[in-house]
Amino acid sequence: MEEGVSIYLVSDSNVDTAENIASIAAAHFDTFIEKIKKYPYVGDKNQIEEIIMEAANDANSIIIHTMVVPELKDYLLKKAQKFGIKIVDVMGPVINAIEDSTGISPHTNLAKNNKEDYLKKIEVIEFAVKYDDGKDAMGILLADVVVIGVSRTSKTPLCMYLAHKYIKAANLPLVPEIEPPQELFEINPKKIFGLTIDPEVLVKIRKERLKSLGLDANAIYATEERVKKEIKYAEEVMKRLGCTVIDVTNKAVEETANVILNVLKGGEIS
């Protein structure tokens, strides 16, 4: 019997290009494609680690990516090779072929044609990476938008999505045992967006994450009691801040981002 294939689509932007190519290829082997998983707006090495661990658990997996940020792209390749996972760079060969044929550096070409737009995009993406997961409280003061919430509410991919909309976004995890930094209470609450989620849904998400990492799915991190405690604490912090709260239960990253963009324009949560 033929062995099934699991396809992982990975990008630091949307996965449309990778998905289109994968779909065309899969049409020739549709009876042997076990699953196709999408990972858009990948913004840090931890996300890459999770993707790699999940792909490594599949007997026959392929990663198709359109990563642009050099540091993350190289890290993805390195990790995939370490675990013997097949990896396809969709954009790289095309860009390299054009560069070889024309003698024009892709970076120079982009900068020449649209320097201001290109540099701004790189700046906000690097900002999202630098101030991800509360790494530096200074990001709270510098950001256009600050996203807060408990673990596994898609804060990082949301900030990467906003970066592609030219918005400097920082994010901060809320944990009962750790008091939020004072900087969070010093900025305009209109810049802060709190993410909440249905406890049962979050329990399932966390259990799946633990499984993908080869850890015990029944760890305290994924228990109903712990999840409810964290969500209650997070919502109390959001109330203290007086910030906008968004329920991300069963919401795609794009949907949550559109809510934020609408609020920033003076609209309301729909």
From Swiss-Prot:
Transmembrane segments: none annotated. The keyword Nucleotide-binding applies. It comes from the Bacteria. Keywords: Kinase, Nucleotide-binding, Serine/threonine-protein kinase, Transferase. It holds the Pfam family Kinase-PPPase. ADP binds at G149, V150, S151, R152, T153, S154, K155, T156. It catalyses: N(tele)-phospho-L-histidyl/L-threonyl-[pyruvate, phosphate dikinase] + ADP = N(tele)-phospho-L-histidyl/O-phospho-L-threonyl-[pyruvate, phosphate dikinase] + AMP + H(+); N(tele)-phospho-L-histidyl/O-phospho-L-threonyl-[pyruvate, phosphate dikinase] + phosphate + H(+) = N(tele)-phospho-L-histidyl/L-threonyl-[pyruvate, phosphate dikinase] + diphosphate. One of its GO terms (molecular function) is ADP binding. The keyword Aminoacyl-tRNA synthetase does not apply. InterPro entries: Kinase-pyrophosphorylase, PPDK_reg. Belongs to the pyruvate, phosphate/water dikinase regulatory protein family. PDRP subfamily. Bifunctional serine/threonine kinase and phosphorylase involved in the regulation of the pyruvate, phosphate dikinase (PPDK) by catalyzing its phosphorylation/dephosphorylation. This is Putative pyruvate, phosphate dikinase regulatory protein. It comes from Thermoanaerobacter pseudethanolicus (strain ATCC 33223 / 39E).
